[in-house]
Amino acid sequence: MAKEINMNIKKCNYKLTNLYYGLVFSGYVLTLVINGFRSGVFAALLMVLIAAITGIFAIKSDTKSDFISLINVCVFAYIIYNFFSFVWIMKNGFPLSVFVEEFSNSVLPAVFYFVPALIIKTEADDIEKEKITDSIYKAFIVAFTVFSIISIILYITAPQFYCDYLFNMSFISKADASTCRVRMESFTGSTSISYLGVAAMLVSARFMYKYASLLSVNKTNDKNKNNGDTLKQFIIYSALFVFSLIVVFLANGRAGMVAALLVIVYINILVFSVFRFADRKYLYIEAGAIIALIVILCIITPSIVSKIWARLVSLPGAIGQRSEQWVSAINNMYGQWFGNGLGANGHKAIGIEGAKVVADGGLVKLYCEEGALGFSLFAFIILVIVRQSFKDLKKYFSELGIIMTALLMSIGSNIIAFQLCMPIFYFALGVIGADANGNAKEKGELKEENKCG
């Protein structure tokens, strides 16, 4: 009976995690037609539900002792540390609402770390684990693609009701079509859609590599009958990779475009140099195709190319402009060890006396709010996970990319404090963390067997 209950809890967690981005994206679309619909509150409630289901499963599991590991304890401690920061944020004169919103946006998504760490890990079969992980990634990319198609249609047509919506949401300064088309704001803002596009590129690359590997194996084993479906899947995810890249450039965010270009370089280095998976001639073909595309765009739409180039080359100057804001925020911290409290340097604190808002620079903002202790704990978690990813880069290159691009973009933007972006970030951390815990346990069991022998 208990085993059946655990199985039902686990299935419920799978389904809710699979549906999460689809439901949240639907919530954002609903804000267009339902005035006053709180998409952020809706997303927070879903995360609380996922946290509750995951926690119940962990408590009822027969192997819950397996989940007590250094990295899992550190992530849990990080959540608790930030939760109790409401004490010093209120002590520093900030209202509780500032803390609640920031906790919901940047820390509550950490529950997604425990989905693979506590749920997927219980599957004894590695193949079954991979299937579950793949299903969650596929659900994310399907939801993102549908959401992006709706966004692109509205961006291109720019109907007046959509322009009014963007103006009311403070995404644009004037409710007309020309202002609407400066960048694709979607329903979430251009920064969020940029990072999600980069994450979708990396998820697509995961499946491209998977199906390309299957094609290679089938060719070696003369299993040509299986090549049709595998090739179809490879083409689909290649198209999704390109589509996600286009979405990032339509969003017209500097950090997003740079991250997308770095992802292309990263994937090519892995495929042609690290993994040595493909012949170099394909690299030359790809380079030729990219050059040809740029030349064609320069001929057909030179204004778009010059606009993108101007955005990219302005990145160093933008960082220089924001550095003064960062230095001011750090120099005016209430306490170096514990920080100002979660939310004290966020947008919600604008207008509060004594607040030093870090409008762009998520990592600096995180340091100011969490202090040396909280930020060191966060950095330790990242370092442990990244170190583990390098032990099996073929398996984790997608997750590593999702993590590192979020950190890279958080130098000049507040990606790390965006509620919509953080679930995929923490899920990627959890996928690597779950296997790190499993490998440590296997090594321990092997040592015990050797002692007995």
Segments the model singles out, each with a brief description of its role:
Residues 134-164, 186-252, 257-270:
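Alpha-helical transmembrane segments of multi-pass inner-membrane proteins
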Residues 153-159, 251, 268-313, 331-332:
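A membrane-periplasm/extracellular boundary helix in multi-pass inner-membrane enzymes
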Residues 304-370:
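Long extracytoplasmic/lumenal interhelical loops at the membrane interface
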Residues 21-25, 52, 202-207, 265, ...:
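Transmembrane alpha-helices of multi-pass inner-membrane enzymes
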Residues 1-21, 59-61, 220, 224, ...:
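A juxtamembrane structural motif centered on a specific transmembrane helix
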Residues 185, 247, 355-389:
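A conserved mid-to-late transmembrane alpha helix and its immediate loop/hinge
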Residues 73-76, 80, 95-121, 135, ...:
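Aromatic-anchored transmembrane helix interface
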